[in-house]
C-alpha cells in the first residue's frame, strides 16, 4: 500500500492526540487476537503509535501499569484488551521492563497500515472483543455485565449471548465517546471451534443472524457509521491456518466457504492460508517461528507447555504473520471496501448528518440507540437467536416456528436486553 499525502488538514506531530477516530472492531476467536507466541517487540516492530488507541477492559493499561477503567480510551499495543486476557502469558525470554509482556496480535498493525490513508487529525480506535476457543455451536455462554463486559469464560457467539452483548455495547461506547467518531469496519476471525463440533453446519446461519442483529442494533447510530448506515459497515472475515483446513476439510468448506462471495451483503472474505508464493502462512509451530539468537529475537520455539498459547501449535498464526501478511491483507480489504469514498479521497473528515429521528448522540454520555430484537425463521432456532421459552416448547419446522404449551400453563417467550431501564422508561414498539 502506498501512502497518500493529504492536503487541507493540520499536520499532527508525534505527541498530538487525534480530534476524532475511525472505529475498527476486532471480534471472533483466538486467531483474531494476541495468540502469536514470538517475543513481543515494543521498541521496533510492535511500537505503539499515539494515533492508535483501544477501548480498555482490564484495570490497568499494561500489567502493573497505569490504572484505567472499562471502556476508557487508552493506548493500543501488541496485546489488546480482549475478552480473554493474554497479558500474563509471557515469553520466557521477555524483558518485562521493556514492555515485552504477553503475546502478539494483529490489531495494532491493522491500524498502522490504515493511518497513512486517514486525515492527519484523526486516529484509529480499536474495539477488541475476541475470545479464544469461542464458537456459535459449542462452548460456555458465560455472563455479561454493563460495567465489565463479557466474563472471561464466555465462549459462545450468537444473538443475545454475552459475547454479542459485549460486542454491541463496546461498539456503541466507542461511537458515543465523540459524535465525530465513525465506525469503519468489523474485522471478524472465527470458525475453528465450530468445525470441531458435530453441529458445524449451523455456524453460517447463526453468523448471518448475528450480523443482521448487529446492524439492526446500530441503526440509531447510522450517522456515525461508514456511508451513513450500519448496513454499509463491512465485515472483513479472515481465514484460518492450514492446520484447520487439512484436518477438517469438509467442515472448512462449509464454515469458511460461507464467508465467500458475499460482497453484496458487505461481507468480505480474506484468505490467509498461503502467501503470494503458495507457501503456508507461518504459525506458532516451532519450526515456523525459530529463534534468531544473534539478532536477539526468540520465537515460539522457545516457549514450553508452561507458557505457550496452545499445545497444538499450528492452529494459530505466528507473531510474524500478525505483523505482516494478516494485517496487510485485512487493511487492504478494509480500504477496498470503504476507501473509495469522498472522506478518503479528499482526506477530510466525513460529515456527520443526524439520522432521521435525531438518533445521533450529542455527547459521550448520551445513548439514543434503537434496540431491535427479532425472532426470524431465517435466522435459525429461537434459542440460537437468544430467546428462551417458559412453560412450553418452540421448534422451527419448514420455515415456521411451532409453539407447544404445557397443560394448564401460559407460555412466554423472553429475550435479554442490555438496557432494561431504558426499555421500561422509554417504551418500544412490537411488530408481529
Q: Language-model segments: what does each one mean?
A:
Residues 4-358:
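Cell-envelope and extracellular/periplasmic
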Residues 115, 125, 374, 429-431:
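Residues within well-ordered beta-strands of beta-sheet-rich folds
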Residues 357-391:
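Extracellular carbohydrate-recognition regions
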Residues 370-372, 400, 427-431:
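Intrinsic-disorder/low-complexity, polar/charged segments enriched in Ser/Thr/Lys/Arg/Asp/Glu/Gln
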Residues 391-412:
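Short carbohydrate-recognition loop motifs
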